[in-house]
Structure formats: structure tokens, C-alpha cells
Amino acid sequence: MSLVLLPAVDVADGQAVRLVQGKAGSETTYGSPRDAALAWQNDGAEWVHLVDLDAAFGRGSNRELLAQVVGELDVKVELSGGIRDDEALTAALATGCARVNLGTAALEDPEWCASAIARHGERVAVGLDVEIVEGAHRLRGRGWVSDGGDLWEVLERLRAQGCSRYVVTDVTKDGTLTGPNLELLAQVAGVANAPVIASGGVSSLDDLRAIAELTGAGVEGAIVGKALYAGRFTLPDAIAAVS
């Protein structure tokens, strides 16, 4: 099975942006989210990873804009950012996206998260944003500024709740073009009992080939952001490299 690539469109203040290590204020702007998403579709993407950064950081929302973008795309969309209650979840699913990512809510409101997973199954994935501090794997929430507990304890709970998919990010790698944390991906895939999507750090076609080596271990896909925007490789090149 070939690795699924999900080009990312991160949206802040109505613009497509990329951050460094997820930090607010580190944005580089790349124009219209609609144009970015349609460009990835035209380049052969099967999925687009669409993120509302303002909602993730709790400083507003781009909900209507994101709904328009999802409506215009013919490919599948994974929608993420600030989905922390029924109202936000219902609105996100109503866009017609294929699935949503829960992040902070999975850490701060386990009961609600369990209920969302029970109700929507495959349409709900959980984002595990990991920071390795002195050897400990800590989870980060609220746009990566709050501590969300121990990765392995939270993963055990989510596994018991029947979570269908995990998006795993090493936050120290995201937006840095320094290569993915392959060890972390393999460790999570080894205990998750569900498919894992890699996020953060991809800088080259070799990085994607290395992630693709983990498909047999349970890594299903990779989100690619800055490397595409920075011109390290094209999406058609990336698709060819992993298929």
C-alpha cells in the first residue's frame, strides 16, 4: 500500500500561512487558501489537510472560508483546528469534509472526545502533538502552548475509546524542514492499533521515502506543508516517490 500524501493548507486571518514549530507570530503568508487547496488538487492530491489556526489558537475562526474551500474541492479534506465542542464539530462535519481532527479536546475533555469517536467513527481522528522533554513524551494542546499529559497514557485511553486514526506531530520538527521523527512514528504505530498519519519536518523526497518504509508498520499517510511551499519538491514528484 502506498503512502497517502496530504498537502497542508494552514489558514490564519483568511490567508494560507506556514508556521515554524507551530508558534503564533512565526507565519509566512502564501496567499489565498482556496487557490492553495485547488493547486494541490490540480497537482494530483487525493487529500488536503486544512487547518484553522485562528480557531486552534483561540483567537477567532475562519469557519465560513474553510467551508467554502471544502465545498469547491473534489478531493477529500481532513479538517483541523479548534474543534472542541459539539457546535464546532457539527459545523466542521457539515462542510462535507471526509474527517476532522480533534486535538486539544482529546486532552482536556476525554468524555466529549469519547462521545465524538463513538458517534462519528472513521470521520474523527485525533491529533497527537508531541514534545519530547528530557526523554519524556509530553502532549501539547491549545495551539501547542499547554501541557496535555503523557503521550502513552493518553494513547492508551484513546485506544480503549476506539479512536480510528491518529495524526502524530513532533512539534519541535514542524515547519523546520529538519526531517520527520521516524522513531516516534514507529513507536506510536506500534501501540496505536489504528492507522497513523505523520506530520511535521518533511524536507525532502528521501524523508517521504523513509516514512513510506513504515507503511507496513501502520503509518498510512504523511502531511506535507512547508517543503512544498518552499519548493523543496513538487507534489507530483512526491506522489511518484512514494507510489
UniProtKB/Swiss-Prot annotation:
<dbReference type="InterPro" id="IPR011060">
    <property type="entry name" value="RibuloseP-bd_barrel"/>
</dbReference>
<feature type="active site" description="Proton donor">
    <location>
        <position position="129"/>
    </location>
</feature>
<protein>
    <recommendedName>
        <fullName>Phosphoribosyl isomerase A</fullName>
        <ecNumber>5.3.1.16</ecNumber>
        <ecNumber>5.3.1.24</ecNumber>
    </recommendedName>
</protein>
<dbReference type="InterPro" id="IPR044524">
    <property type="entry name" value="Isoase_HisA-like"/>
</dbReference>
<dbReference type="Pfam" id="PF00977">
    <property type="entry name" value="His_biosynth"/>
</dbReference>
<dbReference type="InterPro" id="IPR006062">
    <property type="entry name" value="His_biosynth"/>
</dbReference>
<comment type="pathway">
    <text>Amino-acid biosynthesis; L-tryptophan biosynthesis; L-tryptophan from chorismate: step 3/5.</text>
</comment>
<comment type="similarity">
    <text>Belongs to the HisA/HisF family.</text>
</comment>
<dbReference type="GO" id="GO:0005737">
    <property type="term" value="C:cytoplasm"/>
</dbReference>
<dbReference type="InterPro" id="IPR010188">
    <property type="entry name" value="HisA/PriA_Actinobacteria"/>
</dbReference>
<keyword id="KW-0028">Amino-acid biosynthesis</keyword>
<keyword id="KW-0963">Cytoplasm</keyword>
<keyword id="KW-0822">Tryptophan biosynthesis</keyword>
<dbReference type="GO" id="GO:0003949">
    <property type="term" value="F:1-(5-phosphoribosyl)-5-[(5-phosphoribosylamino)methylideneamino]imidazole-4-carboxamide isomerase activity"/>
</dbReference>
<keyword id="KW-0413">Isomerase</keyword>
<feature type="active site" description="Proton acceptor">
    <location>
        <position position="10"/>
    </location>
</feature>
<dbReference type="InterPro" id="IPR023016">
    <property type="entry name" value="Isoase_HisA-like_bact"/>
</dbReference>
<dbReference type="GO" id="GO:0004640">
    <property type="term" value="F:phosphoribosylanthranilate isomerase activity"/>
</dbReference>
<comment type="pathway">
    <text>Amino-acid biosynthesis; L-histidine biosynthesis; L-histidine from 5-phospho-alpha-D-ribose 1-diphosphate: step 4/9.</text>
</comment>
<dbReference type="InterPro" id="IPR013785">
    <property type="entry name" value="Aldolase_TIM"/>
</dbReference>
<keyword id="KW-0368">Histidine biosynthesis</keyword>
<dbReference type="GO" id="GO:0000105">
    <property type="term" value="P:L-histidine biosynthetic process"/>
</dbReference>
<comment type="function">
    <text>Involved in both the histidine and tryptophan biosynthetic pathways.</text>
</comment>
<keyword id="KW-0057">Aromatic amino acid biosynthesis</keyword>
<dbReference type="GO" id="GO:0000162">
    <property type="term" value="P:L-tryptophan biosynthetic process"/>
</dbReference>
